Amino acid sequence: MLFAEKNILSVSQLTGLVRNVLEDNFDHVWVEGEVSNLATPGSGHLYFTLKDASAQLRCVMFRASVRALKFKPSDGMGLIARGRLSVFDARGEYQLIVEYLEPKGIGALQLAFIQLKERLAKEGLFSDSHKKDIPRLPQRIGIVTSATGAAIHDILNVLNRRFANVQVLLRPVKVQGEGAAEEIAAAVNDLNRYGSIDVMIVGRGGGSLEDLWAFNEEIVARAIYRSSIPVISAVGHEIDFTISDFVADLRAPTPSAAAEMVIKSKAEISAELEALFHRLGMAVRRLLNEHWGELNGLVRAVKDPSMLLGHLAQRLDDLEGRSWRCIRQLLIRSADTNHFLHDRLRLQNPVLRLERCREQLLLVQSRIEKTMMHTVERAGQSLAFNAGKLQALSPLATMARGYSIVKKLPGGAVVTDRDQLAPGDSLDILLRKGRAICRVECTHD
């Protein structure tokens, strides 16, 4: 009878009662602590312990809630958790079913930004070696932004003011909210597949960190990194920085600034062209001055081509005389040799050997004569050719047709333009024969 009066419960019954008490009274609690024993099995759930100096609490965060996390928890991290208490029947342990997590002392989005930035930097996505140059004068600009936001209007206004002829291709997207990051990444990929785009602007106007968050998503960063088209990131205001700013080829503080940076104004382009024309003119004048200097050098070096021809003819005569002297000496030596051999052979009477030597001697003599004649003929042809070139290049041939060379005194600078002269200047005029000293009365066009 004693035991019959007692209400005896099974372990499962008692555990169920405890669970009901906990779930009814602690269905929405906030708790803070340090993470330990963090586990992430293949199921996608998150298991960890929150502890402080004197106690610990087992926690579980199911896969649906884990997917909403913007950052990655780790052991030793201080966290603030929101959830409900329950009991894990198999071990009889109470635990916190976590529905929301945020880092202690820093916002979840800010921590997620820092973690992703550090990871992508280690992978090299921000490396300067990967940055592409922005074209100096793009013909077609692709824009990824909202079709109804202020950013597209600011960009178009600036482009129309600076260079209205440029073509613009808008790929409209959501720039905030669920699915915005996926749309932005898809738009970047679409413009790369479309082709014929010289440069791309990806951005939006200002807003809170939450509003700009789509441009901090990894999927957007990797799409910009893979883009073969140079990308300018233009998100928010000058003080706003996003992951897309670091991975893009160029960061603009605002969408309007991106339009200013992507193309020069017509006035700037005109100024650059004018500077190029000025440099070209200076280069042409420098070349002309160099050639005039060469002409003056030729005039000083070659006073009269006939004199140079005379020297060359004299040298040719000298060579011809020396050649004939060599031939005569060879013939004399050959004759002496012939007489010597003849005397020796006459003593020995070798008729056949003498005849062969005589034939060889005549052959050598013929070859020597032909060689010398050919040498003299080639020297004469070279002389005639060089004489023709000198005659063609000589300013005297031009002066023989009535032209003259005018030099300004003193100094002897060659005059090619009336702007070099003034009334009263003295001139030295070189004629085909002789020269004349004149004075300038006036100049005309």
From Swiss-Prot:
It catalyses: Exonucleolytic cleavage in either 5'- to 3'- or 3'- to 5'-direction to yield nucleoside 5'-phosphates. Bidirectionally degrades single-stranded DNA into large acid-insoluble oligonucleotides, which are then degraded further into small acid-soluble oligonucleotides. Keywords: Cytoplasm, Exonuclease, Hydrolase, Nuclease. The gene is xseA. GO terms for biological process: DNA catabolic process. This is Exodeoxyribonuclease 7 large subunit. It is found in: Cytoplasm. GO terms for molecular function: exodeoxyribonuclease VII activity; nucleic acid binding. Its EC number is 3.1.11.6. One of its GO terms (cellular component) is cytoplasm. It holds the Pfam family Exonuc_VII_L. Belongs to the XseA family. The keyword Endoplasmic reticulum does not apply. It comes from Geotalea daltonii (strain DSM 22248 / JCM 15807 / FRC-32). Heterooligomer composed of large and small subunits. Its main location: cytoplasm.
